[in-house]
Amino acid sequence: YDQPGLALLETFQYFIGNTDWSALAGPDGEQCCHNVVPYARTDGSLVGVPYDFDGAGLVNAPHALPDERLGLRTVRQRLYRGPCRSTEELQAALARFAAVRPQLTALFTDNPRLEARRKNAARSYVDEFFGVLDDPARVTSAFRRNCAP
């Protein structure tokens, strides 16, 4: 995998609160991957494209339940499921989100198809993510506490 792209994918999954994915391992009987499709670029590097977000906290689907092995009470609880990244890799991925913060927020607040209750819930969830990004101690806690060595 292209490592900056993979770090961005991992951070995106944390942003939306999705724990139902793996860019490296598939479910029993499948070699790779789970809710991520690896695509080859023209230079031969792989980029992962995530899909199937019904288990994400941002979506908050009524039928969604957290994986009991993860110790989460609801799908709205975020858990970083990626590897331990260097400070530089992590900061680069987080900077991509910070750079488009107004646009990400507007996706929900300016969407006429969402009812007010869903807009407010989505806005709150997005704001929680940026609250983590705005606090270096919370970044360390969120992205270092459960990362895979």
Tell where the protein language model's regions lie, with residue ranges:
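Middle-to-C-terminal accessory/interaction subdomains
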Residues: 70, 74-149
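Short secondary-structure boundary/capping segments
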Residues: 64-66
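Conserved kinase catalytic-core segment
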Residues: 1-62
